[in-house]
């Protein structure tokens, strides 16, 4: 029987010196010393990261000067460029844009930090500063390497990052790099989590393999975190997972020692700022970690970290929460095949999705890893196991609502992979102890044996993942089967081919489809630009068609504002949840497209109806309509309010008549009583579907306006015709003149509470999601301003950053030596109980 010395595997003793390490110290320490297990562990991480780089850079596309395309990713291109060109120069990280959805608050409800990374890489600094910073940073870097002061590795890494950020990088390359950086460093993040939490090199190295299993998971493609989801546009989610893994490492160590409050706060804040859904999992893990070792000190540690991370991220999170009533709910349908998604994955969303790696085997290993974690006092494993169980419970019992339960699956799967890796690592450790027990010469041979097994396991797993990716040297295809070294499989992981499609870019797409190709897309953009020069800038409603994938993604026309410098806006945009105009767009899309996407659930969609569609275009002040199908083009040519202006490839472009941005109302608006902004959608949709001939309904308004319930039919109270002139629209403002004051007019810009008006009363939210103002002066100005909550949030973040610096400089004086309860002592107490019971039995 192998005798296990609990003290030799205690987390606190294994992690005793970790607090003295720099952030990257543990990584480079193994390379500098002669410790073979550490070297093999680090080399495992290196191989894992290099393997990912090999996969995400097919044919060198990662470094080609092209514009990424493919799914949502191809539409994400708009965002960082708008941030760079419009928001940051105006000292904003969120603000108004007219480019999509008749205007919406950009980065108010979508994560801005990942986009900032792209901007920083793309812009760099101006050339003189580049030269000075490059010279200075290089000199400092050399001095750091020579003198090796305290924390020299951290400062050296910072200098390298600074050099990277000051050099301008092509926008497409910067975008591609940030897209995959989360994938590239996830194995390192998993390894670092293990080392911070007190694990030895071998199990930490195995965690990097667990990250690989998650990245190349073939069972989901839009939930977030794996390669396919990242290529679908969920790169912010992947970055958030990386931050979350490192935070968990600091968390596990922090509840035992009280160390690293500042660093833990930074990574928890980054987790939320990169993606809120991952932050929910981080909060869950935090509560579980403290529950496994509750004490006054651990509660204080977590409270400080929570307050710091919350205040640091307040500049974005607080306005998001405060104005959450203006979020759009896409109506995601809850996944109810519970046994499939949590156990065997035999009912997945698409034919190309597979149960790879096999989830049943992973779960068996994860259960074993959980038992080992309790037996051998691995707090990381205990916390992950409890968190995975709670996540699975939430997946089943979370009611259908705004939080789509499918988004919980990545955290569940990742936890299982990490636990499975811990199980395999423990088996290797036990085998190493067995070797040591039977070795009469070198008592360290067991450690080498364990390390060798761990390294071989990681390498073997990389080959296992490489086979369905079909990238191994010497591999060949015979029919649908891939052959390599006697191995035959028809399994195909689409990840690498998806990368090639996306990163080869818009520029490399050719007209292989009925519609498509870069040249055709460029001609369409140029045609719209030319029309705008002659007939004015404005919004475009383009017919949706699956055939548009020939451009790289059916969302390609969303980039018209990007390519026309904001002159031509697209009614459809990417950030569906960021605008309450989104459902009205999809209703129009359904009326004006032969094959609409109808992306939002539970809406009263109509089939193709040119009359209703044009009426709705006029309601939203849309200037142009572009048809691509024969049906849409034929019907549009017959409509009296549409004038054909140009043709471009398969597109026919029409001018929409009587569609100004400001319009006189026929009837007095009606204020809907007891209606909150969060309940706006249903009555607004009902009013929208009735057409433009009815009474505009509002939330709040002038005292003399009629008040109605949602069921009431408002009276038709005619208003005098108001002459409107000199309409001038900018990115975040609208100016116009009226010929008569005191009469309400409709402003066809999406409503948001940050809008302020000068020279009028209002603005009030009006159906479908526009604004009504009552001029008090001839000249009326609307401007998108900072709300009070925005200013308060920035102040809290400023205070948080100062507090972060103070906490980082102050040593935690709380006593972490005792706890009210500790899961790490369960096995010890159980062993003592068994020994005591055996002793009593022997005495009797």
Language model regions located:
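Active-site lumenal/periplasmic loops and adjacent helix-entry segments of GT-C-fold
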Residues: 49-131, 153, 165-245, 249-250, ...
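Perimembrane helix-loop-helix junctions
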Residues: 281-308, 433-443
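Membrane-interface transmembrane helices that cradle and orient dolichyl/undecaprenyl
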Residues: 138-151, 239-263
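Active-site-proximal, structured, solvent-exposed surfaces of multi-pass membrane proteins
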Residues: 11-13, 130, 702-838
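Extracytoplasmic/lumenal acceptor-recognition loop(s) of multi-pass membrane glycoenzymes
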Residues: 91, 95, 111-112, 268, ...
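Membrane-interface alpha helices of multi-pass inner-membrane proteins
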Residues: 250, 261-275, 287, 308-311
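Periplasmic/ER-lumenal interhelical loops and adjacent helix-loop junctions
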Residues: 70, 301-375, 476-526, 690-695
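Alpha-helical transmembrane segments at the extracellular/periplasmic loop-to-helix junctions
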Residues: 132-135, 237-242, 277, 315-316, ...
